């Protein structure tokens, strides 16, 4: 069981991107920080908002890159390399077009699925893709040409409530995630689905 040492939440910086679908991962890390009473502060060395807390005698770091999404790997690699955190000790939370709002799933490894944040992280980690992912469903607009505007848009309240519920489900399995008990975390999380 590989325990997590770094939790990353992907998004774009600036008020114009706050609460957009693409910032679902950043929203998750903000909620983790709240739950652990962690103050996230800008650290230019790591190109992001950074915080840490202790879990069973070891440090767990939180990171929200303040680069744009397609440069997320610069931030993740800077922090992971400095603290000698291996890819398999990293959890990256991100928005997922291929799942409906209200669904959250964990997986390890795999490709980037067209997600520019994941693409850059894989590249900056030396093409290592075996980090863990928390995929937060945001749904799909129906056509590839609509994706950019969709992910950079704010969800209607009913959809945002479903995303918030899926983040709650993920927070419920945070103890298992931190312990590296992925089988139990997946079983619990994957049986949940938000309701309107």
UniProtKB/Swiss-Prot annotation:
Keywords: Cytoplasm, Hydrolase, RNA-binding, tRNA-binding. It holds the Pfam family Pept_tRNA_hydro. Transmembrane segments: none annotated. The record marks 12 as: Discriminates between blocked and unblocked aminoacyl-tRNA. GO terms for cellular component: cytoplasm. It is found in: Cytoplasm. The active site is at 22 (proton acceptor). InterPro entries: Pept_tRNA_hydro, Pept_tRNA_hydro_CS, Pept_tRNA_hydro_sf. The record marks 95 as: Stabilizes the basic form of H active site to accept a proton. Its EC number is 3.1.1.29. It is an enzyme of class 3 (hydrolase). The keyword RNA-binding applies. GO terms for molecular function: peptidyl-tRNA hydrolase activity; tRNA binding. GO terms for biological process: protein quality control for misfolded or incompletely synthesized proteins; rescue of stalled ribosome. It catalyses: an N-acyl-L-alpha-aminoacyl-tRNA + H2O = an N-acyl-L-amino acid + a tRNA + H(+). Its main location: cytoplasm. Disulfide bonds: none annotated. Hydrolyzes ribosome-free peptidyl-tRNAs (with 1 or more amino acids incorporated), which drop off the ribosome during protein synthesis, or as a result of ribosome stalling. Catalyzes the release of premature peptidyl moieties from peptidyl-tRNA molecules trapped in stalled 50S ribosomal subunits, and thus maintains levels of free tRNAs and 50S ribosomes. Monomer. PANTHER family: PEPTIDYL-TRNA HYDROLASE. This is Peptidyl-tRNA hydrolase.
């Amino acid at each position: 069981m590989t325990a997590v040492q770094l939790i990353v939440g992907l998004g774009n910086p600036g008020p114009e991107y706050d609460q957009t679908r693409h910032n679902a991962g950043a929203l998750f890390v903000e909620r983790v920080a709240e739950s652990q009473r962690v103050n996230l502060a800008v650290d230019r060395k790591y190109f992001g908002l950074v915080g840490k807390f202790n879990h069973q005698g070891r440090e767990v770091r939180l990171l929200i890159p303040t680069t744009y999404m397609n440069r997320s790997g610069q931030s993740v690699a800077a922090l992971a390399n400095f603290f000698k955190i291996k890819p398999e000790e990293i959890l990256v939370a991100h928005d997922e077009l291929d799942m409906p709002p209200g669904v959250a799933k964990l997986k390890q490894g795999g490709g980037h699925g067209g997600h520019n944040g994941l693409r850059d992280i894989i590249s900056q980690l030396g093409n290592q893709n075996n980090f863990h992912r928390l995929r937060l469903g945001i749904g799909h607009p129906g056509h590839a040409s609509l994706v950019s505007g969709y992910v950079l848009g704010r969800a209607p309240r009913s959809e945002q409530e479903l995303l918030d519920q899926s983040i709650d489900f993920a927070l419920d399995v945070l103890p298992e995630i931190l312990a590296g008990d992925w089988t139990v975390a997946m079983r619990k999380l994957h049986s949940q689905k938000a309701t309107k």
